Amino acid sequence: MLRSRPARCWRILHTQRDRLSIRALHSESFVHNPPPWRPVSALDEYVERQIRPISLRQLTFFGRTLTESRLLSSANYVRTELPTRLAHRLRDIQKLPYVVVANPHFSLVYELYYKAFERFRTVPEIRTLDDNDRFCDILRKTLKEHLVVIPRLAMGVLECRGLLPADAMDQFMNTLLRARISRRVIAEQHLALTETFNSPWHFPGSQDRTDLNADFVGEVFLKCNAKEVIERCGKLVQDMIRQSSGSDKIPEISVQGHLDATFPYMLSHLEYIIGELLRNSIQAVSERYQGLQQTPPPIEVLICEAPQHVIMRVSDQGGGIPREILPYLWSFTKGPHSKVRLENLGQVPAMAATLQELSVSSEIKHADKETFRESSLDTLTSRPPDLRLGIGLPMSRVYAEYWAGSLELHSLEGYGVDAFLQISKLGNKNEQVTTRAAIDAV
């Protein structure tokens, strides 16, 4: 089920203005000014509060029967939860050495987070639909402002990699990204519920005010079919690589196993992970067989459905991962190509971490318009598909582990790579806001 046409048109009209404002924030923020002094005690009240995690099942059950009362309850949950989650991450940044916090990229992120914290904690209780509309405007504004966070964090950890142990910096980055996902999930879910409530096909007089057979409840896709997502993402990635490289050695994608496996999930999260795994495999095979006569072997994807999980194995014959890169595969800070990664990240003013933000031709975008669910942020960010940032796999693991899944890679040098993605099938696992390493340390 796609978003209503008026909503899409509204986004198109505002795309150019929003892109300009994001670029302005990106360029102006390189002029680094000392942050204003703030009392540490301002955060104390919210740091002492416990984060209230949610599961996909809770999001689904809450949004199925959407009434005005439930919509306002959702708004007030987001209103109180966002400053709490922001406060915990602000305190984490405050605990870093000053020389790290003074980095202009980290300083910008800190200022954005503190500004959002002050903004949300001063929002009064939401009692009416008009209050909710004003709150949604605040959410959209903040989501747009924070599109610069991922590239800035990535540049910050690369520039500060000699100031803290690499493992500590990676864990810090993982925690901030996981928390960022958590905030965007609850914010975008509420925006989607509000859009559903205000849509013309939503009837106020009915007891159950949403379609029980709808594929989406807010941003939660109830019938996520692994085979369909793989084939859809695979076609988009094949077209992107063919367009960017001009290569005719693009391998086919073979999908086998439990082809009917379905599960509830955030579609944009799964598309990002699958897209990244397929992109790496297709690029490796295409480069290995470029200039050779034989047809490149296919990328083989096996889907296995277990009682509580769905496991996907992506196998390629692209020659494996070079030995000098393998130890740094999941790191945001380490690796032999850190300097190149830093230069490439400087070309990315904003990033939503979705598959759709990769720049492709207008023909491909038009062809996939009705097959990919449109995000409210997709039109605000774009980057060339061949621009290597070095954060795709670490970011994919963050997405996978966020809903209590996992992502592992096994490389056979000289042959290829097997990637294993495990997804919780039942949707009953709470979001993993805290990293496993942090939990173990408690």
Predicted regions and their residues:
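Signal-transmission coiled-coils
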Residues: 37-252, 267, 271
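ATP-lid-like helix-loop hinge signature
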Residues: 280-315, 341-366, 371, 375
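Short acidic-aromatic loop segments in the C-terminal HATPase_c
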Residues: 330-334
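Conserved ATP-binding N-box helix of the HATPase_c
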Residues: 236-240, 244, 266-297, 306, ...
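Glycine-rich G1-box
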Residues: 319-320
